[in-house]
């Protein structure tokens, strides 16, 4: 039995908006627009600058940032407006997503279209959404102090919260849409499939570290790095003493290594599980791998990089869908009516 149609559509819209938010966030980062707004004003920040005086005030605030001093000291007002608007759209869309998600919850709860367990789950998502907004500002603040870019660790944390939010929303949507656990498989195969999906999440976080360090702008060949599969600089004692995840070479190598590992581990899944979901997941993994290589050799072309980022979420969605269709031996079938009373 499916959940109320309106609930299913609403969750589908929220999932779609989250993916669009990922695209906007990627474009914001790739165009170096994220540090153009130097204040966090959740309410009054909805209104953009109006008039030349207001724009000049915003540009003056931007002039106090490390990014302006190191990278954009000669930026014109028109160019500043362009990057400001990109970040403004990013923040405004985040507010819109929060409103679209939060406002219908009381109505669905009062009209009994969702049960108490679902209400609790959705309120947890709303709380995570608030944390995500705060994490976004925490990330931006790291680029307003000394260095002209945000902390790659905070960027990874920001992305991980998005992954968590999207996964919960997508799983809820699938269950409300009536997706059932209909294919029985062994515990070993189920947990192998789950581990590959977990590796996908790890790879997405590593991708955020690569992006935060601008590591994609180096070693723009594949499969070799500096003429070798394993670059010699990885064996430097200085690297290990200075911090492995601070090093551009190390982080990019890890991202490459996990990508290959995911492809190798995902390849046998369709033959083990014998489901269309496993084939879809493998296809997404393969396409995402090719997008990653294309992004690298193009020296991070904006379109390819944005598609690579959002397709990571598409691959994750395919993985979650694959797992939702599986039932371990000895377990009971999980029905698809988790959203109704």
Curated annotation (Swiss-Prot):
Main localization (coarse): membrane
EC number: 1.17.99.9
Keyword Iron among record annotations: yes
One Pfam assignment: COX15-CtaA
One term under GO cellular component: plasma membrane
Membrane topology term: Multi-pass membrane protein
Assembly with partners or alone: Interacts with CtaB.
Family: Belongs to the COX15/CtaA family. Type 2 subfamily.
Transmembrane spans: 7-27, 92-112, 118-138, 159-179, 190-210, 253-273, 280-300, 302-322
Classification via PANTHER family: CYTOCHROME C OXIDASE ASSEMBLY PROTEIN COX15, CYTOCHROME C OXIDASE ASSEMBLY PROTEIN COX15 HOMOLOG
Reaction it catalyzes: Fe(II)-heme o + 2 A + H2O = Fe(II)-heme a + 2 AH2
Cofactor(s) the protein requires to work: heme b
Chain positions recorded as heme binding sites: 255, 308
Protein name: Heme A synthase
Gene Ontology biological-process annotations: heme A biosynthetic process
């Amino acid at each position: 039995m499916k959940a109320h149609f309106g609930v299913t559509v609403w969750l589908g819209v929220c999932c779609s908006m989250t993916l669009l938010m990922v695209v906007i966030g990627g474009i914001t980062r790739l165009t170096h627009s994220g540090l153009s707004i130097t204040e966090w004003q959740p309410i009054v920040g909805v209104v953009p600058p109006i008039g030349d005086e207001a724009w000049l005030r915003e540009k003056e605030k931007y002039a106090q940032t490390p990014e302006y001093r190191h990278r954009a000291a000669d930026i014109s007002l028109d160019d500043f407006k362009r990057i400001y608007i990109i970040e403004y759209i990013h923040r405004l869309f985040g507010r819109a997503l929060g409103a679209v998600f939060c406002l219908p919850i009381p109505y669905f709860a009062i009209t009994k279209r969702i049960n108490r367990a679902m209400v609790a789950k959705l309120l947890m998502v709303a709380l995570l959404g608030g944390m995500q907004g705060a994490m976004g500002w925490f990330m931006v603040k790291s680029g307003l102090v000394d260095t002209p870019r945000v902390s790659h660790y905070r960027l990874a944390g920001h992305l991980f919260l998005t992954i968590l939010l999207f996964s919960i929303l997508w799983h809820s949507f699938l269950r409300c849409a009536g997706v059932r656990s209909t294919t029985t498989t062994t515990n070993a195969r189920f947990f192998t499939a789950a581990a590959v999906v977990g590796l996908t999440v790890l790879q997405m976080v590593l991708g955020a570290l690569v992006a935060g360090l601008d590591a994609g702008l180096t070693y723009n060949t594949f499969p070799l790095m500096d003429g070798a599969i394993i670059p010699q600089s990885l064996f430097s004692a200085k690297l290990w003493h200075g911090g492995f995840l601070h090093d551009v070479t190390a982080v990019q190598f890890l991202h490459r290594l996990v990508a290959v590992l995911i492809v190798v581990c995902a390849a046998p899944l369709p033959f083990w599980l014998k489901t269309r979901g496993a084939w879809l997941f493998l296809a997404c993994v393969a396409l995402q791998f090719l997008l990653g290589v294309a992004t690298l050799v193009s020296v991070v072309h904006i379109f390819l990089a944005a598609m690579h980022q959002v397709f990571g979420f598409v691959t994750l969605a395919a993985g979650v869908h694959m797992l939702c269709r599986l039932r371990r031996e000895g377990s009971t079938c999980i029905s698809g009516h988790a959203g109704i009373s």
